[in-house]
């Protein structure tokens, strides 16, 4: 009896790691490609000038915030879709996709309008430097086109990932990323007879690649049997699913937007401490993203796998899977820190910044060798484990208090009241992830996050009512 039980547990463990690697590898490749594109942007702009790097880095905060909005909407959609996919309810998945598209398209259109008509106002929030405002405004005006495409593709790709089609999602992103790098080089350096457009060229390249990605999504949708990109899904009405979506998405959206806006406040603080700090931070962000790809891929894959298990009603199994996922994340976080440390000399060798920015760059990179671990563990639990069971409120409360009550006020106080040196301000800002660890681990051990959030006979009940 004991031998059989051991074999059963061993098989379950093997099955978990097999499924995790099947989901994680494409996501890692996708994240690496994304980091590679961002790296290419910064490396190419490095040859244009420090002002171009700084301006694009500040203007890109809007893309980051908007991405977090899409991520929040995609989270609500993918959490529901992952669990309904576990029940093989495709009709519910279509309705959920339609709800997410309604919100993403409306938000994209609003931000695009502001980028078209008031880009200077958007830049003045981050800097008072006239040169940076001018460069960033040209960049934002073109990026408005990107926002319109992005809102549709991010929702569809989130739905594909939620049903386990991570390879297709990876392939579509790969197409956009490779095209982005080629077009960046073309418009920044004036290749193939194109004009040298600098920062504006980066925006044109991004907009073009996102448009191609949208077209590719339409083609994939046409070939798909069930999970399609269909705007008519926006007109599917389900009061129950809408309530469930709002219950999950609003806290997730609020969490992601609150966190991303607060994180952008770090750029506001650094932006008013000088262009050297901004330029150094733009390179550090790229390196940190490279070091974090394994961690965030595990969190994304874990959300899909745990969601499917919970949708089938096996809550105890989901807790075992969550424990294994956390162990994988800790290992990945340690590896990420080593990667950042290992490539620091290479970054220092090829960065073309002035002496002040190079000094900041060196020590900011060292700080991020440990910062990755804090970010990895919190992402795995808050954005992975907890959300897989529909627990999105905890992250909203936890991150809002951590960022807006602790980190952002501390950063402003350190920079503008105590007037501490730039590196001390940066160090204090990078304590944000570790401050919330006790709270996060306590919530994890309680196990209340493990829930089956699907409903039986969903559309039949609505027809009856």
Over which residues does each language-model region extend?
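Transmembrane helical elements of multi-pass membrane transporters/channels
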Residues: 22-41, 142, 153, 176, ...
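Transmembrane alpha-helix boundary and packing residues in multipass membrane permease domains
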Residues: 27, 31, 42-43, 60, ...
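Helix-terminus/linker motif at the lipid-water interface of multi-pass membrane proteins
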Residues: 32, 36-54, 123-130, 186-197, ...
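Small-residue-rich hydrophobic transmembrane alpha-helices
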Residues: 53-116, 150-169, 267, 280-344, ...
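Short runs within selected transmembrane alpha-helices of multi-pass transporters and secretion channels
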Residues: 74, 143-162, 169-177, 202-217, ...
């Amino acid at each position: 009896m004991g031998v059989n039980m051991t074999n059963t547990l061993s098989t379950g463990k093997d099955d978990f790691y097999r499924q995790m690697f099947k989901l994680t590898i494409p996501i890692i490749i996708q994240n690496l490609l994304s980091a590679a594109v961002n790296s290419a942007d910064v490396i190419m702009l490095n040859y244009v000038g420090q002002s171009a790097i700084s301006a694009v880095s500040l203007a890109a905060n809007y893309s980051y915030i908007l991405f977090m909005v899409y991520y929040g909407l995609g989270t609500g959609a993918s959490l529901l879709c992952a669990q309904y996919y576990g029940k093989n309810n495709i009709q519910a998945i279509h309705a959920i996709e339609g709800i997410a598209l309604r919100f993403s398209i409306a938000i994209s259109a609003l931000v695009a309008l502001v980028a078209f008509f008031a880009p200077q106002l958007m830049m003045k929030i981050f800097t008072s430097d006239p040169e940076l405002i001018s460069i960033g405004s040209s960049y934002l005006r073109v990026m408005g086109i990107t926002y319109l495409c992005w809102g549709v593709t991010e929702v569809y790709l989130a739905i594909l990932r939620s049903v386990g089609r991570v390879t297709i999602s990876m392939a579509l992103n790969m197409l956009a990323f490779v095209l982005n790098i080629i077009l960046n080089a073309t418009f920044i350096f004036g290749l193939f007879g194109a004009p040298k457009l600098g920062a504006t060229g980066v925006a044109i390249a991004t907009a073009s690649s996102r448009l191609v990605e949208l077209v590719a999504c339409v083609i994939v949708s046409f070939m798909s049997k069930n999970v399609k990109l269909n705007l008519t899904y926006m007109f599917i009405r389900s009061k129950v699913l809408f309530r469930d979506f709002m219950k999950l998405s609003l806290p997730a959206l609020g969490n992601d937007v609150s966190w991303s806006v607060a994180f952008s406040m770090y750029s506001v603080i650094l932006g008013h401490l000088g262009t050297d700090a901004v330029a150094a931070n733009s390179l550090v962000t790229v390196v940190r993203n490279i070091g974090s790809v394994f961690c965030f891929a595990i969190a994304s894959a874990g959300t899909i796998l745990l969601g499917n298990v919970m949708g089938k009603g096996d809550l105890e199994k989901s807790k075992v899977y969550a424990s294994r996922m956390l162990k994988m994340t800790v290992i990945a976080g340690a590896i990420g820190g080593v990667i950042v440390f290992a490539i620091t000399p290479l970054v220092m060798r090829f960065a073309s910044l002035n002496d002040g920015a190079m000094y900041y760059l060196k020590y900011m990179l060292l700080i991020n060798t440990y910062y990755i671990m804090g970010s990895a563990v919190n992402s795995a639990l808050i954005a992975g484990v907890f959300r897989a069971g529909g627990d999105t409120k905890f992250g909203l409360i936890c991150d809002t208090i951590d960022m807006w009550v602790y980190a952002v006020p501390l950063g402003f106080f350190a920079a503008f009241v105590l007037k501490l040196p730039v590196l001390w301000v940066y160090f204090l800002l990078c304590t944000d992830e570790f401050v919330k660890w006790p709270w996060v681990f306590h919530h994890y051990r309680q196990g209340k996050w493990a829930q089956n959030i699907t409903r039986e006979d969903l559309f039949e009940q609505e027809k009856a009512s």
